[in-house]
Curated annotation (Swiss-Prot):
Domain of life: Eukaryota
Localization per Swiss-Prot or TrEMBL: Cytoplasm; Nucleus
Example GO BP: traversing start control point of mitotic cell cycle
Name of the protein this chain belongs to: CCR4-Not complex 3'-5'-exoribonuclease subunit Ccr4
Amino acid sequence: MNNPPPMMGYQPSGGGSVTQMLGTPQPLAQPLHQTGPTQQAQQMLQQPPGLVSSGTRQMLGQIGQVGSNPLCHPHQSDPTLVNNPIWKLQLQLAAISRQSVGQANVYARQNAMKKYLMTQTNGSQQPADMAKSLVDFTKQYLLEMAADPAVPNNAALAASGQQIQRPHGTPVSTPSTPKAELANNAQTTPSILLQQQQKKLSQFNIDEDDEVEHRMMAPVNTKYDEQLWHTIDLSNLSVYNLNENLFKYDFLTRLYLNGNNLTHLPASIKQLQNLRVLDVSHNRLTELPPELGMCYQLKYLYFFDNMVSTLPWEFGNLFNLQFLGCEGNPLDRQLIKILTEKSVTGLIFYLRDNAPEIPLPEPRRFIEVNADGESVETYRCIEESTNHLNEELLKKSFTLLSYNTLCQHYATPKMYRFVPSWALSWDYRREKLKDEVLAYQTDIICLQEVESKTYEEFWLPILEKQGYSGIFHAKTRARTMQSKDAKKVDGCCIFYKNSEFTAVFKDAIDFSSVWMKHKKFQRTEDYLNRAMNKDNVALIIKLRHERTGEHVWVVTTHLHWDPHFNDVKTFQVAVMLDYIEKLLKQHGGVGSPQDKKKIPLVICGDFNSQLDSAVVELFNTGSVRSHKDIEGRDFGYMSQKNFAHGLALKSSYGSIGELPFTNLSPTFTDVIDYIWYSTQALRVRGLLGEIDPAYAAKFIGLPNDKIPSDHIPLLARFEFTKGSSATINTNGNKTV
């Protein structure tokens, strides 16, 4: 059979039969809709054997069986679905999909025809319907439905709207989509949801076929994509099994497996995390693998005419999904109810918010490190490690925690659509953060992304009760705002145990203002256009260790986030280190350049810089002369001196290897948080280990119900080396 796709178009809702709603030409409507899928399959099977392959004949027989099963077509038992715009779209697209059964590599053929027709018309006309693929029709119909004023905006279609609380162990009979994630619409009807989807289907949402053309027209200085193809079409080829090598092509954005004899999809499909389109319609699947939920970039997922009865909870990760083709399956009626009332967005949110708890196998281990920097023992927690320390080391050491806590104003449902709404709420997260920070009981606590109000009303009262004192410094813009608005600006804070330390000196750095006051300040174009408007800060405190009389300088910072401004981050670190060196000279009794290397110093925070960055090179080597991050940039004196500093610093995790990640998100997972220390004054004696890898592999990003931030905390135990600051004069009592 080689019928072209039906000449369909979206028809405004409101009465009429399924045939009329589909707008199918009468010659095609007769065999398609009036005789039903079973008879259609029988008619095709009656054709001469040479026209239909054996695999196709088997598939058509299967479709016929599915078509005769009312469980696979809920509108047969519930006629109201015929007038539901969401289900009408299912029927439209399922009918289009069925027309391609038996056409080998149908997507490739349609794409070739589309390109041919565009070439013939010089791109002046839209391709004919016969050249449109199922994906093309899907996008077209979604846009038409979203723009159609005739689609009923009926509040009766919306669910009862009961509040979703922590759901584990409690079935939700009438689930609802969190209002915050549906733009607080009073009526969350299919038409409203489709209008929201229209924004995602705009011309700026480029699909991969368009990206190929876009790359061909890209400017010469655009980074070249070496991978020239991103699609595999194995449609209608009588495939029974898939080779595992297929899933090593992690660059794939489209995979077409429809019209085959597949009975399962392998778990390794999770490796295709660039996948945007997957069509597995007209197979013999009885389930979809939970691992498919890791393919969070999926926009269009089709599994028409299989035997799938439910959806994995892991599909709650598919926050980019715009269409889920499920007609022709004995899908659970509760899921169909949610789909038709809340659209695919509400269905995904339901799966996300009601997913069973994934237990954390064990807490992060604490790794004991010997004087040579080698790991020698692993403990279940830092408390257990402390209990095993000898008395001398316990007296000469202290512990420090660095943690980006994810400011509540950054943790929006729009930015973290993969996180259950209840787990993203600030009330829930702050309790988790409090429990986590207090559980570590470190001597020094350095936090980033803390709102002024949160510091004053949450962290300070809690930690003061635990015997801590603290200081805080908000980002620069807080100094230009009214008090009420300034309370919402985040910054950095440092807490220290009063039983372990006494504050000797405090200061803060606003990078831009500090540099403008520098005696060698120059108004370069890069500083004015790229760095001056960044309002990042650093917070500094000098502490006296009560048990040893030693002094340690503690600095915490949060650098600019944008990877396109890695030069600015390098500049910010250079300004910070330059300022710290001046403070060490003024308030540390530094006589020679070598003296400042012997002063205990810890610099920690979120540096938004990967291990191969200029920032890390600057910390490790003392300067950065030639690096892609700073290539062609001019920050005046800082660039002229290669951003150099005179401190001897090293990452605390350097001796045992950095963690697999400190920040986990769908689009970025890497190490960007560090604890740097002065190697001639301090020695690392313990480190907090990684999150259980098997547990982390089950999530596309953080936070979640167990980990309340998109970052994980770093924790280190430091030992003062003998006499590191015994000869250094310690004066000064400046405060902020």
